[in-house]
């Protein structure tokens, strides 16, 4: 599939309220196509990386290379609150306002516990008490298990929650 076609499909998927998932071999340009989509969605606003609350003149870009994360990095550290209820302390790496793209790359190489956490963000746009702001789009990418890139098969709940786009 050509990058222009992938861009068109991803826009359609996002407009339908779903998360696109680019699935393809190593080095075929999946990440570059997602970055290009972010540039188009920014609509002449400044793209800012790793800013969790971009201003109206900015468009956020947060790129999680999931193979580098552990579940506590995304799921937060558990603690007991003043009300004796278990809570989670997040590390401040998830968006709290504004608009942008939350890109989960190397999804298939991530540990299954990380995949499960991201699955909740994809489907429910939340993680425990954390709620992903409306202005943020979730996009995923990864290699196929047949690519021998250390990839795991995608969990069925994630396949059901995303629109898989095969990218060559």
Question: For each of these PLM feature ranges, what is it?
Answer:
Residues 1-168:
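AAA+ P-loop NTPase catalytic core and its hallmark functional loops
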């Amino acid at each position: 599939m050509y990058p222009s076609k992938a861009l068109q499909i991803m826009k359609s998927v996002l407009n339908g309220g779903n998360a696109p998932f680019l699935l393809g071999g190593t080095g075929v340009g999946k990440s570059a196509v997602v970055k290009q989509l972010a540039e188009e969605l920014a609509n002449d606003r400044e793209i800012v990386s790793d800013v969790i609350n971009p201003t109206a003149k900015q468009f956020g870009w947060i790129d999680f290379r999931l193979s580098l994360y552990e579940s506590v990095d995304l799921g937060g550290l558990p603690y007991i609150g003043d009300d004796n209820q278990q809570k989670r302390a997040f590390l401040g790496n998830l968006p709290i306002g504004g608009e942008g793209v939350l890109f989960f790359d190397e999804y298939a190489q991530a540990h299954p516990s990380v995949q499960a956490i991201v699955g909740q963000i994809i489907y429910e746009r939340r993680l425990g008490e954390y709620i992903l702001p409306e202005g943020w789009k979730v996009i995923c990418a990864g290699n196929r298990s047949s690519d021998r890139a250390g990839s795991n098969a995608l969990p069925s709940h994630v396949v059901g929650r995303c629109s898989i786009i095969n990218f060559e």
